[in-house]
Regions:
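N-terminal leader/linker segments that initiate helical-solenoid repeat arrays
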Residues: 19-26, 30-136, 156, 438-441, ...
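Residue signature of alpha-solenoid helical repeat architecture, marking inter-repeat boundaries
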Residues: 91, 95-98, 132, 165, ...
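Canonical tetratricopeptide repeat
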Residues: 99, 140, 173-174, 206, ...
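Residue-level recognition of tetratricopeptide repeat
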Residues: 102, 109, 143, 176, ...
Length: 463
């Protein structure tokens, strides 16, 4: 178990202030934005000056991109327009560009639109063009790259950042990248540095994920509750994310009513929060309430139409008997393809036994970018779906290397072991998956039951 697990228990004895925003992938973005804006005392003076660019930077493409007008009537769109105006009036000062960059990050998080992370990265490029090549630009760039799943580039930038400055969010983004790449021990060490510097929602939520990732569910729940206790009522999305993660941990523990309460809390704090709706749909499916699950999952998939969301919706619709609508959703998954979530699409194809060569290709491409347990699992599953079970075996070993207690990892490992005639491990892993089968989608639970029956029949014939 990583050293972070031992050291966290000591830090829990400290007293904590009211904490701010956090998510695992982009956990600290809004607190940075709030701090930047709070420290900025510039007032807008209507008509005081011409807001058109009169600066050599106006010819630099990244600067033009980030100042381009965009449509939208939501409050976040007004924030972006205001920050763009301030950037123009400050002659593209680095602080103004930094605030604009974090506002784009906020927009990306609220809308699940990754194109705004691209704009945040362009803000960092524009900052550097002004000569501001210091840690503030590096943090913004590392954050954007990590959110865009450009992990190798992000790691390079994050390591450069922590070599020049050692603030909590610097270690946070480095840890995020390393965890995504499968470098769990290094990521845990970065998170420990973050905790030592600032024990708050952001650092404890990250530590909770590491606990879960390394098989300590109870520790993950304890730390996520600690993170939530330090959240601010003014920071709704952060607390909503933490409550959503807690709900999934509670569901895995079998505490379904507590899990529902956690999703209620998340949605009270942040209405239309797709991850909480997805989690709530999963819980309702586990409680055998598919019509209610469909309502949640329809909304979630509309807000964030990634393969995992639409897969859950299709399964829920099938359970209600609406197979025609389920087929429509499945067709949409294929039409959208794997551009936004190659790994998720690969898993879907392999589970359905469709276009397995594409599933392999997508998973292999992902593995060149990040080598975490979930990507190894995706490749193992795709190879097995294509009948290449011997090649799948080493990736199963990697997928289970952190002792992650995840129903999907265990399901895939058990089926692949059975296909490789390893009945002992097949029985063990399928049994472990069955203990937390509430974490699987209905089509996966069907596979689990079918393979457990096959193993049972095979063993009975040997007796």
């Amino acid at each position: 178990m990583p050293e972070i697990m031992k050291e966290i228990s000591n830090t829990r004895k400290r007293s904590f202030p009211s904490f701010s925003k956090g998510t695992l992938a982009v956990l600290g973005s809004l607190i940075l934005l709030v701090a930047l804006i709070a420290n900025h005392k510039t007032s807008l003076k209507a008509g005081a000056e011409n807001t058109s660019l009169k600066n050599p930077l106006s010819e630099f493409a990244p600067c033009r991109f980030v100042l381009a007008s965009s449509s939208g009537n939501d409050p976040i769109d007004a924030e972006i327009a205001q920050q763009q105006t301030l950037a123009r009036r400050s002659s593209m000062s680095a602080p103004a560009l930094e605030r604009l960059g974090w506002t784009f990050v906020k927009k990306a998080r609220l809308t699940f639109d990754p194109s705004y992370y691209n704009l945040a990265e362009q803000c960092a490029a524009c900052m550097e063009a002004t000569g501001a090549q210091g840690p503030d630009a590096l943090l913004l760039r590392a954050h954007a790259l990590q959110s865009l799943h450009r992990f190798k580039e992000a790691e390079t930038v994050a390591r450069q950042l922590t070599s020049t400055r050692q603030r909590p969010f610097d270690y946070g983004v480095l840890g995020d990248v390393l965890i995504d790449e499968g470098k769990v021990r290094e990521g845990a060490a970065a998170y420990q540095n973050m905790i030592d510097l600032r024990p708050d929602l952001q650092s404890y939520a990250r530590a909770a994920h590491v606990r879960w990732l390394t098989g300590d569910l109870n520790g993950a729940i304890e730390l996520m509750k600690l993170a939530i206790s330090g959240s601010s009522s003014n920071d709704g999305e952060a607390a909503a994310w933490a409550y959503t993660r807690l709900a999934l941990y509670q569901l895995q523990q079998g505490a379904t009513q507590q899990a529902l309460q956690s999703t209620d809390a998340a949605l009270t704090l942040q209405s239309n929060y797709a991850p909480a709706m997805l989690a709530r749909g999963r819980i309702l499916l586990a409680l055998r309430r598919p019509p209610e699950a469909v309502v949640e999952l329809e909304h979630a998939a509309k807000l964030n139409p990634l393969p995992e969301y639409q897969w859950a919706l299709a399964d829920a619709l099938a359970l209600t008997g609406n197979r025609e609508r389920a087929r429509e959703i499945e067709s949409q998954i294929v039409e959208r393809g794997g551009n936004e979530d190659p790994r998720g699409y690969s898993l879907y194809l392999a589970t359905r036994g469709e276009n397995t060569e594409l599933a392999i290709q997508l998973a292999q491409q992902e593995l060149t970018n990040r080598g975490d347990v979930f990507t190894h699992d995706a490749l193992a599953w795709a190879l097995a779906a294509a009948g290449r079970t011997t090649e799948a075996h080493p990736h199963v070993t990697q997928a289970l290397s952190e002792r992650t207690v995840d129903a999907r990892l265990l399901l895939h490992a058990g089926i692949i072991a059975a296909l490789n005639n390893d009945t002992t491990h097949a029985k063990q892993w399928l049994q472990e998956a069955s203990l937390i089968q509430q974490m699987l989608w209905p089509s996966e639970r069907t596979q689990l039951e079918a393979w457990r029956q096959k193993i049972s029949t095979k063993l009975s014939h040997k007796e």
